């Protein structure tokens, strides 16, 4: 049987509805901020991403779906959306049209990574790009938009911000960082050693624990900003605070793409286990000119739809849990749990199991039936006129007296 490729999933039924719900919220919010829809190809020249994302980046170096087509063109499936929007902006001469242009997009992106929870080879993003607006107020507006989307979808996340400086302060900082890294090179991981010669700023993004300890003593970009960049970063914090947005300044936040300048930001959430980025972006004032257009300010963000779906589906499954599942570990106790179950049905939705199974099988059945409360009688419980009770939402459990069931469940 032919199946979907590894890391590329079908989206059906509830998943498809959830995807549409997220997109609808994102689109509605973007339109209220003055953004218009843009559709760009999923297949582009490889050179576009080598120049924009950076040849030394992991995306270009390891993760692109790159191939030569039948005409001999070096092409790849897009690994991210910003570069394609910038290419379209230049190709259609929007860089010469004057005025601020704002676009939003959504769709598939492709990276050849090891598939794991929250990370697929074909994944989906919603993104926005604003051109020709250099004010730090627009940086704040972009952050506020993503914050608003998160609130509308009831996703809890922490905002982290940083400034990467400009063409004046970044080279000076890069020199200081390079000196520090070379002094500690022998203690760094192999990826960090490679990045020292290709892109030393990306070393700050390393997640290896012993590298993080070494980097605690690294020079910070926020302490090496020139007067203009420092002033804008301070103003950004002032605007966010005035608009009720809490944040953390993270001087080691560099994002995974080479084109960012000045503002960089990321929203991270602990709702899917360890702290994971659910969306982020920043300013890229040099990218349009770097790709052949006229010098044009740029700022934007992208968010991971699958990450949002994982959080929301987990919440919805908890919200759907209702009622009681009652069972026995031995058939000689089924008469007892049957009577208890019938009594409970006067006040609750109750599923009674007539089969004697082991505890894990019963728990699996209760989970499949989306029960909120699991009740079970085994030998010890029967002797003590008790039931084992587990709350399948709170993940707590204890033994309760049969006479006190109603008090415990309410």
Curated annotation (Swiss-Prot):
GO molecular function, a single term: histidine-tRNA ligase activity
CDD domains cross-referenced by the UniProt entry: HisRS-like_core (cd00773)
Subcellular locations according to the entry: Cytoplasm
One Pfam match: tRNA-synt_His
GO CC field: cytoplasm
EC code: 6.1.1.21
Reaction equation(s) it catalyzes: tRNA(His) + L-histidine + ATP = L-histidyl-tRNA(His) + AMP + diphosphate + H(+)
Coiled coil: none
InterPro entries reported in the protein's UniProt record: aa-tRNA-synth_II, aa-tRNA-synth_II/BPL/LPL, Anticodon-bd, Anticodon-bd_dom_sf, His-tRNA-ligase, HisRS-like_core, HisRS/HisZ
Keyword vocabulary terms for this entry: Aminoacyl-tRNA synthetase, ATP-binding, Cytoplasm, Ligase, Nucleotide-binding, Protein biosynthesis
Any one of the GO BP annotations: histidyl-tRNA aminoacylation
Alphabetical list of SUPFAM superfamilies matching this protein: Class II aaRS ABD-related, Class II aaRS and biotin synthetases
Top EC class of this enzyme: ligase
Family from the record: Belongs to the class-II aminoacyl-tRNA synthetase family.
Subunit comment: Homodimer.
Protein name: Histidine--tRNA ligase
Organism per entry: Campylobacter hominis (strain ATCC BAA-381 / DSM 21671 / CCUG 45161 / LMG 19568 / NCTC 13146 / CH001A)
Gene responsible for this protein: hisS
